[in-house]
């Protein structure tokens, strides 16, 4: 059980193979989804979306003190280790200005989702406070139910409905509000057809049937938007200029390395003062996020001092 997962952040709690016995003790329902691999090892039936959901429930309970967690069918069921990596690398970025990770950081999660995953991890690991924006009523209701079902989370996480689906920060960041960072897992595909094709590939790779693939495959707003990831992030970059003095670092995941050059050009045109890329890896899966700020070193230090 001690084999390490290559590439995870040093503070990530998921460095080693899952201790399934401990997880099943925390969340007994996971027991019914355990299988034996051809090599004779015990594992989770990853081809079964209900098994993946039960695993997530167990991980969140065991490592992050989230005792009640659920998502409706049709919404994304996120891999916890990869989501935790984003939070830990973001913590490092926020710590670079002063030399220590801030304990009172305020974070905006753009598209918090039905799973509320980033705030759940960030609150437990660093004591941060989160605002989560969401365009979907169903996703927002699910996230709110998670917050209300877990003691203490309502003081640390608040949700705001994005009433304009074409907007990202506008209508969410209020006047005289300040954030240490924004984070986002943007829509990946550029059309519903591309999203379906991607889900079909994933289904075949996992050996799922079509009904299973639909179970937690993701909603439209989670999977695709007009122009895909690049268009969405370009919109985010353009909008971020209006909040350049209210947010220290704007950040977003970028799924494909080939999407970076047009985004770097957009950041230059927008007048970003500093741009950072953080590479992440989980096993064979490579990912990254980019971060940009409109403040120089002195302005960033003053922002932190004033905000604290």
Swiss-Prot record:
One of its GO terms (biological process) is rRNA base methylation. It is found in: Cytoplasm. Keywords: Cytoplasm, Methyltransferase, rRNA processing, S-adenosyl-L-methionine, Transferase. InterPro entries: METTL16/RlmF (IPR010286), rRNA_lsu_MeTfrase_F (IPR016909), SAM-dependent_MTases_sf (IPR029063). GO terms for molecular function: 23S rRNA (adenine(1618)-N(6))-methyltransferase activity. Its main location: cytoplasm. Its EC number is 2.1.1.181. It is an enzyme of class 2 (transferase). GO terms for cellular component: cytoplasm. Coiled coil: none annotated. This is Ribosomal RNA large subunit methyltransferase F. It comes from Salmonella typhimurium (strain LT2 / SGSC1412 / ATCC 700720).
């Amino acid at each position: 059980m001690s084999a390490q997962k290559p590439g995870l952040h040093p503070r990530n709690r998921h460095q080693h193979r899952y201790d399934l016995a401990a997880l099943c003790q925390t969340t007994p329902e996971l027991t019914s989804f355990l299988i034996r691999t051809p090599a004779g090892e015990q594992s989770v039936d990853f081809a079964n979306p209900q098994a993946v959901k039960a695993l997530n429930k167990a991980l969140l309970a065991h490592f992050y003190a989230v005792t009640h967690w659920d998502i409706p069918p049709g919404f994304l069921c996120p891999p916890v280790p990869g989501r935790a990596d984003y939070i830990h690398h973001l913590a490092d970025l926020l710590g670079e200005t002063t030399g220590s990770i801030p304990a009172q950081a305020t974070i905006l999660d753009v598209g918090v989702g039905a799973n509320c995953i980033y705030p759940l991890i960030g609150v437990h690991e660093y004591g941060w406070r989160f605002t989560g924006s969401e365009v979907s009523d169903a996703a927002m209701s699910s996230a709110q139910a998670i917050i209300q079902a877990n003691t203490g989370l309502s003081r640390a996480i608040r949700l705001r409905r994005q009433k304009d689906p074409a907007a990202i920060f506008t209508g969410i960041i209020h006047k005289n509000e300040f954030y240490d960072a924004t984070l986002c897992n943007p829509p990946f595909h550029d059309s519903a057809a591309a999203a379906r094709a991607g889900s079909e590939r994933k289904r075949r790779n996992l050996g799922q049937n079509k009904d299973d693939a639909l179970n937690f495959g993701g909603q439209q707003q989670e999977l695709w938007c007009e122009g895909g990831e690049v268009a969405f992030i370009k919109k985010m970059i353009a909008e971020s200029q209006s909040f350049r003095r209210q947010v220290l670092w704007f950040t977003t995941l970028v799924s494909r390395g080939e999407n970076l050059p047009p985004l770097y050009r957009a950041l230059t045109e927008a007048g970003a003062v500093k741009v950072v890329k953080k590479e992440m890896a989980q096993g064979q899966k490579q990912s990254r996020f980019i971060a940009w700020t409109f403040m120089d070193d002195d302005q960033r230090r003053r922002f932190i001092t004033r905000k604290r």
